[in-house]
């Protein structure tokens, strides 16, 4: 049983260490140029339509959560009277 565990450990170690790394193109310089451009556009919109959608969804969720928290605080501050 111990021999099987050692063999399993060797196999797992071998597959992890011998996997080839994926090489991706470095897009950081392109993104830096895009976001550092002085074109009067807000940074949160320079990424395109997906960034605008993400920003709007974040703002909507934030406002909704704030309104809900205020509502719950008001309900806790003014409880219903018991008859």
Swiss-Prot record:
Component of the cytochrome c oxidase (complex IV, CIV), a multisubunit enzyme composed of 14 subunits. The complex is composed of a catalytic core of 3 subunits MT-CO1, MT-CO2 and MT-CO3, encoded in the mitochondrial DNA, and 11 supernumerary subunits COX4I, COX5A, COX5B, COX6A, COX6B, COX6C, COX7A, COX7B, COX7C, COX8 and NDUFA4, which are encoded in the nuclear genome. Gene3D superfamilies: Cytochrome c oxidase, subunit VIIa. Keywords: Acetylation, Membrane, Mitochondrion, Mitochondrion inner membrane, Oxidoreductase, Transit peptide, Transmembrane, Transmembrane helix. It is found in: Mitochondrion inner membrane. GO terms for biological process: mitochondrial electron transport, cytochrome c to oxygen. Pfam families: COX7a. The keyword Transferase does not apply. Residues 24-48 are mitochondrial matrix. One of its GO terms (molecular function) is oxidoreductase activity. This is Cytochrome c oxidase subunit 7A2, mitochondrial. Coiled coil: none annotated. Component of the cytochrome c oxidase, the last enzyme in the mitochondrial electron transport chain which drives oxidative phosphorylation. The respiratory chain contains 3 multisubunit complexes succinate dehydrogenase (complex II, CII), ubiquinol-cytochrome c oxidoreductase (cytochrome b-c1 complex, complex III, CIII) and cytochrome c oxidase (complex IV, CIV), that cooperate to transfer electrons derived from NADH and succinate to molecular oxygen, creating an electrochemical gradient over the inner membrane that drives transmembrane transport and the ATP synthase. Residues 1-23 form a transit peptide. It comes from the Eukaryota. SUPFAM superfamilies: Mitochondrial cytochrome c oxidase subunit VIIa (SSF81419). The chain crosses the membrane at residues 49-77. Its main location: mitochondrion. Pathway: Energy metabolism; oxidative phosphorylation. It comes from Mus musculus. InterPro entries: COX7a, Cyt_c_oxidase_su7a_sf, Cytc_oxidase_su7a_met. Residues 78-83 are mitochondrial intermembrane. It is a single-pass membrane protein. One of its GO terms (cellular component) is mitochondrial inner membrane. PANTHER family: CYTOCHROME C OXIDASE POLYPEPTIDE 7A, CYTOCHROME C OXIDASE SUBUNIT 7A2, MITOCHONDRIAL. The modification N6-acetyllysine is found at residue 33. The gene is Cox7a2. Belongs to the cytochrome c oxidase VIIa family.
